[in-house]
UniProtKB/Swiss-Prot annotation:
Native organism: Sus scrofa (Pig)
InterPro entries registered for this protein in UniProt: FH_FOXL2, Fork_head_dom, FOX_domain-containing, TF_fork_head_CS_1, TF_fork_head_CS_2, WH-like_DNA-bd_sf, WH_DNA-bd_sf
Residues bearing the modification Phosphoserine: 34
Keyword field: Differentiation, DNA-binding, Isopeptide bond, Nucleus, Phosphoprotein, Transcription, Transcription regulation, Ubl conjugation
GO MF entries: cysteine-type endopeptidase regulator activity involved in apoptotic process; DNA binding; DNA-binding transcription factor activity; DNA-binding transcription factor activity, RNA polymerase II-specific; RNA polymerase II cis-regulatory region sequence-specific DNA binding
Pfam families linked: Forkhead (PF00250)
Protein name from the UniProt record: Forkhead box protein L2
Signal peptide residues on this chain, from the entry's feature table: none
Composition bias, Basic residues: 291-301
Region ranges (Disordered): 1-54, 277-338
Length: 377
């Protein structure tokens, strides 16, 4: 009995036959698609309609620009803008007063919108609104949700406030008030301080002013106290009025600072400076000064009695009835003068060295003696 074996080629063909059948069957059996899923995919590609209850995600500027661009003439009136917004977005059918007020504000305040008047006027009211040609591309690629930042055009400042001109005009004056040199350096922010003219100075302005030169204290006080001194002298040398007048003369002079060294002191009644002319006309001119320079004590004399000789080098302490610079307040009062005397005269041995009534007249005697004459009032 003989056994038969298949040849190698036949065996290889038999092994490959089932694999080729499998490859042919695989493309013939694709997985079927369910009808539910296919319908859902078609619905997702359809455009969505805006929800009337939801506010559109656009600003009022975008709504206005959208309405103007989609118009036939590229311009619309205010009522035309309202109608376009209501027709395109039903959300704005309610609460018209609120959003229409916002539309008007954006049209007036935004520089992208230009008002164009109607041609010829007529009975029709309202103006057209259009877009500024420089703001045509303010929305990137037609996307109204994103707005570009536009550079505002340069506008010159008003005429009353321009660089290079003075704050008070070219001449540095406005309304009668002038500042010297104000127009030469702009508004004077970095300029050195200016000084006002003397004609415009006022007491109410807190500007430091140089002090005026001090007049003579004796001449300044004599005119104010002449009447009071005459009345006190007529009443009598013992009256308290004369002492009050003489004491008041030293008060104003002491407040003038370094120009006066007069101190307030109580002088005896009836003692008045003979060079001021108070208490009657002087009986005699003052005696000439001595050639020596040491100080002397001042004497009090009655007007009717002849004046004694001045003390010399060998003079001792002053008598009890005299006043000395060392103790002006402790001096004893002089003897009472007759009632018919016009008043006591205050005589000094040397004029430049008055110790009790030391005023600025004697301080500046050497400097201003040529300009001011000694006149008795």
């Amino acid at each position: 009995m003989m056994a038969s074996y298949p040849e190698p080629e036949d065996a290889a063909g038999a092994l490959l036959a089932p694999e080729t059948g499998r490859t042919a069957k695989e493309p013939e059996a694709p997985p079927p698609l369910s009808p539910g899923k296919g319908g859902g995919g078609g619905a997702s590609t359809a455009p969505e309609k805006p929800d009337p209850a939801q506010k559109p995600p656009y600003s009022y500027v975008a709504l206005i620009a959208m309405a103007i661009r989609e118009s036939a003439e590229k311009r619309l009136t205010l009522s035309g803008i309202y109608q376009y917004i209501i027709a395109k977005f039903p959300f704005y059918e309610k609460n018209k007063k609120g959003w229409q007020n916002s539309i008007r504000h954006n049209l007036s305040l935004n520089e992208c919108f230009i008002k164009v008047p109607r041609e010829g006027g007529g009975e029709r009211k309202g103006n057209y609104w259009t877009l500024d040609p420089a703001c045509e591309d303010m929305f990137e690629k037609g996307n109204y949700r994103r707005r570009r930042r536009m550079k505002r055009p340069f506008r010159p400042p008003p005429a009353h406030f321009q660089p290079g001109k003075g704050l008070f005009g070219a001449g540095g004056a406005a309304g009668g008030c002038g500042v010297a040199g104000a127009g030469a350096d702009g508004y004077g922010y970095l300029a050195p301080p200016k000084y006002l003219q003397s004609g415009f100075l006022n007491n109410s302005w807190p500007l430091p002013q140089p002090p005026s030169p001090m007049p003579y204290a004796s001449c300044q006080m004599a005119a104010a106290a002449a009447a009071a001194a005459a009345a006190a002298a007529a009443a009598g040398p013992g009256s308290p009025g004369a002492a009050a007048v003489v004491k008041g003369l030293a008060g104003p002079a002491a407040s003038y600072g370094p120009y006066s060294r007069v101190q307030s002191m109580a002088l005896p009644p009836g003692v008045v400076n003979s060079y001021n002319g108070l208490g009657g006309p002087p009986a005699a001119p003052p005696p000439p000064p001595h050639p020596h320079s040491h100080p002397h004590a001042h004497h009090l004399h009655a007007a009717a009695a002849p004046p004694p000789a001045p003390p010399h080098h060998g003079a001792a302490a002053p008598p009890p009835g005299q006043l000395s610079p060392a103790s002006p307040a402790t001096a004893a009062p002089p003897a009472p003068a007759p009632t018919n005397a016009p008043g006591l005269q205050f005589a000094c041995a040397r004029q430049p060295e008055l110790a009790m009534m030391h005023c600025s007249y004697w301080d500046h005697d050497s400097k201003t003696g040529a300009l001011h004459s000694r006149l008795d009032l």
